């Protein structure tokens, strides 16, 4: 992988006129879920994504305390590995009558509260860090509305896992796929992530 650029929070000051030339690069978050890490609840992750032409095409999400790794790649599928045991991720193929919405233990904005009111009856599952996407990929939840600030390194690896399992991550306002390195700042727009059964 020599010669492939690397972007992370620690390297966030790379100038846009340099970054905009990148076709392929690694996007890394060595500690996603800082609040979860401080609380010592185990729900923090290490995220590594491969971005190609604005798309997260491969990703690894590692939860050290849980000894669990989620990984996936475009056209190849997605898997969960616990120790030596590996299983494919296929999500829940049929939408539940009462959707399970995954959110953060540390963030629940008024916009998300309004969104939840609009979807009607639902169950709420609180999980930290990129594990929210992974719950969708596993079929343990259906929807993840993130109507608050995130950075590109917070989402890319887990988006790759979820989409490799058949899910989707789209911008809240436009409905277009969430993309990377398409503008000078590294902040994501609001987005909605959906499990395979909801990814219409």
List each model region and its residues.
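Acidic beta-strand-loop-alpha-helix segment within the catalytic core
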Residues: 48-134, 182-200
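Conserved beta-strand segments of alpha/beta enzyme cores
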Residues: 5, 120-123, 168
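Oxyanion/phosphate-interacting regions
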Residues: 114-118, 134-200
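Short, solvent-exposed loop/turn elements at beta->coil junctions and helix N-caps
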Residues: 10-16, 131-132, 176-181
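Short loop/edge segments at beta-strand edges and connector loops
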Residues: 8-10, 82, 128, 173
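Flexible, acidic active-site loops/lids enriched in D/E/S/T/G that coordinate Mg2+ and/or position polar
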Residues: 1-52, 60
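Conserved acidic residues
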Residues: 23-25, 57, 99, 142
């Amino acid at each position: 992988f020599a010669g492939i650029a690397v972007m992370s929070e620690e390297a966030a000051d790379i100038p846009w006129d340099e970054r905009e030339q990148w076709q392929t690069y690694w996007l890394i978050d060595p500690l996603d879920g800082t609040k979860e890490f401080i609380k010592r609840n185990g729900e923090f992750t290490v995220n590594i994504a491969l971005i190609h032409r604005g798309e997260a095409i491969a990703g690894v999400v590692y939860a050290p305390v849980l000894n669990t790794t989620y990984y996936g790649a475009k056209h190849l599928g997605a898997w969960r590995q616990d120790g030596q045991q590996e299983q494919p991720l296929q999500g829940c193929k049929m939408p539940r009558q009462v959707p399970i919405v995954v959110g953060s233990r540390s963030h629940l904005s008024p916009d998300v509260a309004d969104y939840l009111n609009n979807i009607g009856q639902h169950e709420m599952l609180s999980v930290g860090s990129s594990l929210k996407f992974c719950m969708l990929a596993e079929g343990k939840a259906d929807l993840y509305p993130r109507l608050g600030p995130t950075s590109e390194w917070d989402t890319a690896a887990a988006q790759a896992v979820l989409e490799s399992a058949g899910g989707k991550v789209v911008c809240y306002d436009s409905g277009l796929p969430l993309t990377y390195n398409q503008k000078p700042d590294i902040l994501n727009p609001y987005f909605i992530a959906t499990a395979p059964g909801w990814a219409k």
